[in-house]
Amino acid sequence: LYITWGVFVISTSLSYLYSAQSVILTADQNVYLVKLITGLTRSLAYILQIFLMICGVSFWIVCAIELLSNVIQLILFNRLTLKKYPQLVKLDITDTINKENIISVKSKIKREIKYTFVHKIAGVVVFNTDYLIISVFLGITVITSFSSYMMLIQALGFLISAIASPLGAYIGAKLYSDSKEKVIRIISLYNSLFFMLGVFCAYMFYISSSTFVSLWMGKEIVLSQQLVLLLSVNCFVLIARISFDVAKVGLGYMSDIELPLLEAIINIIVSLVLVHYLGLNGIVIGTIVSNIIVVMILKPVFLYKNALKSDNAFIIHELIRSWFFISIFLLSIFFITRAKVIVSNEWLDFFIQVCMSSITPLLLLIMIYSVFDSNVRKFMFVMFKKMYREN
């Protein structure tokens, strides 16, 4: 037991030794290299660990593979950064920055670390409150059904967040190379794109998640379609908020520490009140209320007003614009398809129906945003122009 624990501690400690290198690569818009190294080494480690466990090898050896994975990552990150940034070896920071600036930078870094810590703690509270309240008031059995759907939402959010992570470095680079107005246009475009992606994923989740869970874990795990609709709203928020989170990282703005705390408080209070009247629906509604108030309204307001110094008229216009397009899509898709839920008893038929059902909402979203949203229209024009030149 102590050997296994010691291996895990050493393995975790090693991961901090190459954090500086990953930060440098990310800041230089080479996050794909970070993802390549970490993704490849972890994937190989997981495959080897699974193989060793199947073979019945001692567990401490399986844990040692994790340690070996971090050692390999440390070596690869060190070699890569030395190759790409050889000037770092000879660079003496005291030659380029005076002591007063060093103290100022250290103070700012410490402050931002504290703010980030508060954000992370509040995020843990928000994302785990539902499970705690469900286990206390509704029982452990309900968690199985709830977590099956949440696993799909979180996996989708994790995948999209991983793809979107380089955008933060891009915004940071543009902040210092271009005007504030151009940075605002870029963030506005990201808002439109992630709102599009969010509402598309939420719609597909609504019509397909219950059948997926039924095929995966059995019909007894399936939740009511009314509850699935509520979870779809949370799915939309989880994806749409990525644009704001990416912008915050790019702008280095973590000062809104009161917002995640407010989100957690609203979520807990509303969920505790509504669980007595609406059961599981009430808990999900509590999360929706906190998401809409804090994540979808207050967070962009704080971002535009404090980080970008935008005026109130622009902020109101940006919020109304985003929700207006979503409303048009929802009304149109309901009128066209009636949001018919996919029903299937076979995996192949299910995936075929998912592919077929995704065509209409995807085309409808592209049409709505290309007609009404100038940012998306210009973006699509540039993409088509690049494709035409390549051909």
Feature locations, PLM:
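Interfacial segments at transmembrane-helix termini and the short loops linking adjacent helices
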Residues: 1-7, 205-236, 281, 308, ...
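Helix-terminus/linker motif at the lipid-water interface of multi-pass membrane proteins
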Residues: 51-56, 117-120, 124-155, 173-174, ...
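Interfacial/gating helices of multi-pass transporter permease domains
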Residues: 59-64, 104-112, 134-154, 182-185, ...
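Interhelical loop/hinge segments that connect adjacent transmembrane helices in multipass membrane
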Residues: 63-66, 75-128, 170, 178-185, ...
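Short runs within selected transmembrane alpha-helices of multi-pass transporters and secretion channels
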Residues: 7-26, 34-49, 62-78, 119, ...
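Helix-loop junctions and terminal segments of transmembrane helices
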Residues: 27, 85, 90, 153-191, ...
